[in-house]
Swiss-Prot record:
One of its GO terms (molecular function) is structural constituent of ribosome. The lineage of its organism: Bacteria, Bacillati, Actinomycetota, Actinomycetes, Bifidobacteriales. Transmembrane segments: none annotated. Keywords: Ribonucleoprotein, Ribosomal protein. Gene3D superfamilies: 2.40.50.100. One of its GO terms (cellular component) is cytosolic large ribosomal subunit. GO terms for biological process: translation. InterPro entries: Ribosomal_bL27 (IPR001684), Ribosomal_bL27_CS (IPR018261). This is Large ribosomal subunit protein bL27. Belongs to the bacterial ribosomal protein bL27 family. Pfam families: Ribosomal_L27 (PF01016). It comes from Bifidobacterium adolescentis (strain ATCC 15703 / DSM 20083 / NCTC 11814 / E194a).
Length: 83
């Protein structure tokens, strides 16, 4: 029975990159149109006024203004209050 593995037969030795998810702009912070507000998997936060959602559920500002987090119909919602 071999006491060493053959060349390049190691099964470990790989790792995935961090996903960098989470809230990027917090309540009260100023945002410019296009700024990412939340990066998420699924809709933990839903888009509200002046907020768009990308295909990976990223929320982003559609207008310049300040970020406001709230709850509407038992859903966490993110709004941008236009400046």
């Amino acid at each position: 029975m071999a006491h060493k593995k053959g060349a390049s037969s190691s099964r470990n030795g790989r790792d995935s990159n961090a996903q960098y998810l989470g809230v990027k702009k917090f309540g009260g912070e100023a945002v410019v149109a296009g700024n990412i507000i939340v990066r998420q998997r699924g809709t933990k936060f839903h888009p509200g006024e002046n907020v768009g959602m990308g295909k990976d559920h990223t929320l982003f500002a559609l207008k310049d203004g300040s970020v406001k987090f709230g709850v509407r119909r038992d859903r966490k919602v993110v709004d941008v209050i236009a400046a």
